[in-house]
């Protein structure tokens, strides 16, 4: 089955009850409506993909080259544009320019991967950023309690290895959480209730796609 996807907005978390009256924590995602603005084919572009546009924006804020792309597709300008890769040419036939996608492309019980931008934490130490345990609180430890410790040898190798976990900026990265279950699809309001937490802040842009490792239930 071809992977499906849609752009949306993370609204926040809440909790609902399932059929067994157990509390289920869910993230509310405003999914779509998206509009198809371009279709990529292997023959013409070297790969298969569909370009989706989402979100309202004033036409005054759209630069002319981008406005021309929307005009060529025959749709009003949108705030966000993203390409979703398709598995093969057969999946391309399911889309056409100007087509509108809503939350109904998913069903209750489907499994999805959600991609978003994680919350930025600023400059963080190794204990917060990488989970280091720190150093002793007593036995002569002085002003080193949250330090990482050694970052390499002196003469051998005489340098710090690339990729060594150290302090630095944390968060504000593209993160994907896989195999989340769609608890409920509210087609009337264009909302997905996804079990568990997803990356990013409330109001942030997210991409919801069919789970690549599990697929639909």
Swiss-Prot record:
HAMAP family according to UniProt: Ribosomal_uL3_B
Pfam families: Ribosomal_L3
Name of the molecule in the record: Large ribosomal subunit protein uL3
Name of the coding gene: rplC
GO MF term set: rRNA binding; structural constituent of ribosome
Role this protein plays: One of the primary rRNA binding proteins, it binds directly near the 3'-end of the 23S rRNA, where it nucleates assembly of the 50S subunit.
Gene3D superfamilies with a match to the protein in the record: 3.30.160.810, Translation factors
Natural source organism: Mycolicibacterium smegmatis (strain ATCC 700084 / mc(2)155)
GO biological process terms held by the UniProt record: translation
Keyword terms, alphabetized: Ribonucleoprotein, Ribosomal protein, RNA-binding, rRNA-binding
Record InterPro entries: Ribosomal_uL3 (IPR000597), Ribosomal_uL3_bac/org-type (IPR019927), Ribosomal_uL3_CS (IPR019926), Transl_B-barrel_sf (IPR009000)
UniProt record similarity statement: Belongs to the universal ribosomal protein uL3 family.
GO cellular component, one term: cytosolic large ribosomal subunit
Subunit structure: Part of the 50S ribosomal subunit. Forms a cluster with proteins L14 and L19.
